[in-house]
UniProtKB/Swiss-Prot annotation:
Name of the featured protein: Enolase-phosphatase E1
Domain of life: Eukaryota
SUPFAM superfamilies in alphabetical order: HAD-like (SSF56784)
Note on cofactor: Binds 1 Mg(2+) ion per subunit.
InterPro entries in the cross-refs: Enolase-ppase_E1, ENOPH1_eukaryotes, HAD-like_sf, HAD-SF_hydro_IA, HAD_sf
EC number: 3.1.3.77
Annotated organism of origin: Drosophila pseudoobscura pseudoobscura (Fruit fly)
Cofactor(s) needed by this chain: Mg(2+)
Length: 252
């Protein structure tokens, strides 16, 4: 379906590689969390019940046993040093573990609130958000980053607060992004027919999962995104940015 004739009720956007550059996530956000996790844990270890819960959840993921097995001396107790090392281990391996995402979100929140961090969005994003809202569409976000972290990127973006444009946020609590059931869950949560949801992503596996659940999909080819194979280009609709989607309309 040509983008100029496309209709939808909800635009579901990915963040990394779609609204926001991959380099911002990998070269700014991840190192910030890695560099500040020890300080954050030291300040909140005793006082924050939320952090205590995250620490418990981190110890329950399969990778925790793998990590402790790599240590020269097995830890006698779980302390700041052990969890700091494990968090850095997960970040280095780019493992999308839910309690890690929650912890990163708390660390990033401090950075955004102090002005050390500002969320990157591509230049075409604000105009597209405005056009879709004016046309009566809802905008939702689905990212592997925690809902809290998603909101921070848009609230403290380089162009100001974009959070008011967004109606709903989904993270891995709804399911993994390359599983069809996740998108069925999202459609159910939104109360929409899957065919009325347009999902924008940079990952072919995510697009395939969404299509199998009945969603419309388009793949973004942003600067810095992983190049697509010829087969992936052939089997997906591709756009370079959001500019061709300004004419999105509600179904009649």
């Amino acid at each position: 379906m040509p983008t100029t004739e496309r209709v939808a009720k909800v635009v579901l956007v990915d963040i990394e590689g779609t609204t926001t550059s991959i380099s911002f996530v990998h070269d700014v956000l991840f190192p910030y969390a890695k560099n500040n996790v020890k300080k954050f844990l030291e300040e909140s270890w005793e006082s924050s019940s939320e952090v205590k819960q995250i620490v418990r959840e981190l110890q329950q993921v399969p990778q925790y046993a793998e990590y402790t097995a790599t240590l020269r001396v097995p830890p006698k107790e779980v302390d700041v040093q052990v969890i700091t090392g494990f968090v850095r281990y997960l970040i280095d391996k780019d493992l999308k573990v839910t309690p890690l995402k929650t912890l990163q979100g708390l660390i990033w929140q401090q950075g955004y609130e102090t002005g050390e961090l500002m969320g990157h969005v591509f230049n075409d994003v604000p105009g597209a958000f405005e056009a879709w809202r004016e046309a009566g569409l809802r905008i939702a976000v689905y990212s592997s980053g925690s809902v809290a972290a998603q909101k921070l990127i848009f609230k403290y973006s380089i162009v100001g607060d974009l959070l008011t444009h967004l109606s709903t946020h989904f993270d891995t609590h709804v399911g993994h992004k390359q599983e069809s059931q996740s998108y069925a869950n999202i459609a159910q949560s939104l109360g929409e027919d899957p065919s009325h949801i347009l999902f924008l992503t940079d990952i072919p596996g995510e697009a395939a999962a969404a299509r199998s659940a009945g969603l419309q999909t388009i793949i973004l080819q942003r600067p810095g995104n992983t190049p697509l194979t010829d087969d992936q280009k052939y089997s997906n609709e591709l756009i370079a940015d959001f500019s061709s989607l300004h004419t999105l309309q509600l179904p009649e």
